[in-house]
Curated annotation (Swiss-Prot):
GO terms for cellular component: centrosome; chromosome, telomeric region; cytoplasm; nuclear body; nucleus. This is 5' exonuclease Apollo. Keywords: Chromosome, Cytoplasm, Cytoskeleton, DNA damage, DNA repair, Exonuclease, Hydrolase, Isopeptide bond, Nuclease, Nucleus, Telomere, Ubl conjugation. Its EC number is 3.1.-.-, 3.5.2.6. It comes from Mus musculus (Mouse). 5'-3' exonuclease that plays a central role in telomere maintenance and protection during S-phase. Participates in the protection of telomeres against non-homologous end-joining (NHEJ)-mediated repair, thereby ensuring that telomeres do not fuse. GO terms for molecular function: 5'-3' exonuclease activity; beta-lactamase activity; protein homodimerization activity; protein-containing complex binding. It is found in: Chromosome, Telomere; Nucleus; Cytoplasm, Cytoskeleton, Microtubule organizing center, Centrosome. CDD domains: SNM1A-1C-like_MBL-fold (cd16273). Signal peptide: none annotated.
């Protein structure tokens, strides 16, 4: 990856690894070649600065959101804030890099001094006439494209290389020409060849869309048989492809590159056409700028010793106060948090799922299972009366037992067959319980539905229901009209705790088992035989 985070600044150029970016908050893209976009994808969510052409290609090819792309005009200076409040700013100027469509150099000016980042570029003397460089600009740090920084590598200019390609094509007037290219670049070479030989240049639909964006001459087409010059991807040119092409029509292939290419076929030619500066051009460029220091962009090719005599002896690197460095680092971290918050707000909210309580569900399933198991064998006379009123005991309980019990006992709800929560009332079986009649809580429609023609119990003279005193429950002479005598319980009535929850479930789980409950029933029967007691139906909420 040919990118860098400039030390002691919040600037990152062609660097897209956020984990290694540190305090960087301003990200710049020189051009769209793949070795400069490693790590950049559609998930990118930071402001990104580039040229207008690169901005268009970035959105179309990598699907980076337009919300994060900041297109800056080439040849103009732009003031950018270095913190979220705009207290510290810097100036950036974009200069045409003469490398590929949309490629630029960045000139940064701020508290850190003046930094020129060339990216990939092909030097021409006209670059020194740029307004940003012509005013005797003092460059403190020059980040230099050192791809061809090798004294042994002699490269012709692009005009000279173009003439070599023209002469080569003229040697094969009856042949088709395959030009091996990368995904971006050398479109101007294709235009010159089309105009020189008065033929159409056949492109892929993707590259045709690109040349239309660049506004080049109308000499390109996607029709295979329209012209003899075909631009293909460099990976398509191989020995098998050459055999196939030559079977249908005589064909030669040309690689316009400064890289060493091993020719797998005698009809494949390499011409040293390069979009990177040659060694002599780099020397001329550095000598004209006379920076304080030169930093190579391609880290695998150190080249500092080649430019020692071209550095400025009088220019010193600016001193950045430690307080400024701390301030810029802290502000960048705060801004990164704001970016993350903004990105999070743009995401669609995840829909939550409400789960039932596992304990509640387990208790409900257990009680339902036990209730169904003992349905026939554990019916008390009172429960049987309810079943005669309504064929479905569950429906009868829902209709007959409203949630008024909560007001009298305030006990927690442990189980309810319906969606409405209810409170279970319990009382020792030795004593009778005086409760409010159940029929008065029924609406007339409900009473008719379950087959009641008259109230089950008369209300009596008392105004509101109240729990009877325990002293009045045993040995009383004649019960009031609204209290019914308890029917003697039979052995079949065992297991009522699990069926009708006369005892809270957590009591049963805590040791008050059904066996203990059966003992209470037997004890109650003995009391009934010795002294008949009064038992009214138990209200269950």
């Amino acid at each position: 990856m040919n990118g860098v985070v400039i030390p002691q600044t919040p600037i990152a150029v062609d660097f897209w690894s956020l984990r290694r970016a540190g305090s960087a908050r301003l990200f710049f893209l020189t051009h769209m070649h793949c070795d400069h976009t490693v790590g950049l994808s559609s998930t990118w969510a930071r402001p990104l600065y580039c040229s207008p052409i690169t901005a268009c290609l970035l959105h179309r090819r990598l699907q980076v959101s337009k919300h994060w792309i900041r297109a800056l005009e080439v040849g103009e200076s732009h003031v950018l804030p270095l913190d979220e409040i705009g207290q510290e700013t810097m100036t950036v100027t974009l200069i045409d890099a003469n490398h590929c469509p949309g490629s630029v150099m960045f000139l940064f000016e701020g508290y850190f001094g003046t930094i020129l980042y060339t990216g990939d570029f092909r030097y021409t003397p006209s670059m020194l006439k740029e307004p940003a460089l012509i005013l005797g600009k003092q460059i403190h740090t020059l980040y230099l494209d050192n791809t061809n920084c090798n004294p042994a590598l002699v490269l012709p200019s692009r005009q000279e290389a173009t003439q070599q390609i023209v002469q080569l094509i003229r040697q094969f007037p009856q042949h088709n020409i395959k030009i091996g290219l990368y995904s971006l670049g050398k479109e101007s070479l294709l235009e010159q060849l089309a105009l020189e030989f008065r033929t159409w240049v056949v492109l892929s639909p993707q590259r045709l869309e690109l040349v239309q964006l660049l506004g080049l001459a109308d000499v390109f087409t996607v029709e295979e048989e329209a012209g003899r010059i075909h631009a293909v991807d460099h990976t398509e040119i191989c020995h098998s492809a050459m055999l196939q092409w030559n079977q249908s029509h005589p064909t030669i292939a040309i690689f316009p590159t400064s890289r060493k290419v091993r020719s797998p076929h005698p009809s494949i030619y390499t011409v040293p056409y390069s979009d990177h500066s040659s060694y002599s051009e780099l020397r001329a460029f550095v000598a004209a700028l006379r920076p304080c220091q030169v930093v190579p962009i391609v880290h695998q090719k150190p080249c500092g010793e080649f430019f020692q005599d071209s550095l400025s002896p009088r220019l010193a690197m600016p001193l950045i106060p430690h307080s400024v460095q701390q301030y810029m680092s802290s502000s960048s971290r705060k801004t990164n948090v704001l970016w993350q918050l903004e990105r999070r707000l743009k995401r669609p909210r995840t829909q939550g799922v409400v789960f039932e309580s596992p304990e509640e569900k387990a208790n409900q399933v257990k009680v339902d299972r036990d209730s169904k198991k003992h349905k026939k064998e554990n019916l008390s006379p009172w429960a049987g009366h309810l079943e005669r009123l309504c064929p479905h005991p569950l429906q009868a309980r829902k209709q007959l037992f409203p949630d008024f019990c909560r007001k009298e006992r305030d006990e927690p709800v442990l189980f309810c067959d319906s969606n409405k929560m209810a409170t279970v009332l319990t009382a020792p079986l030795e004593f009778s319980v005086q409760l409010q009649p159940i029929d008065e809580f029924l609406f007339p429609e409900t009473r008719e539905k379950i087959g009641l023609e008259s109230p089950l119990l008369s209300r009596g003279d008392s105004g509101s229901p109240a729990r009877g005193n325990q002293s009045d429950c045993v040995g009383c002479g004649s019960p009031p009209a609204h209290i019914s005598r308890a029917v003697p319980l039979t052995p079949e009535s065992r297991g009522l705790a699990l069926k009708y929850l006369l005892t809270p479930v957590h009591f049963l789980q805590a040791g008050f088992s059904s066996r203990n409950f059966d003992k209470q029933v037997e004890k109650h029967q003995r009391v009934q035989r010795s002294s008949p007691a009064v038992l009214s139906p138990v209200d269950v909420g």
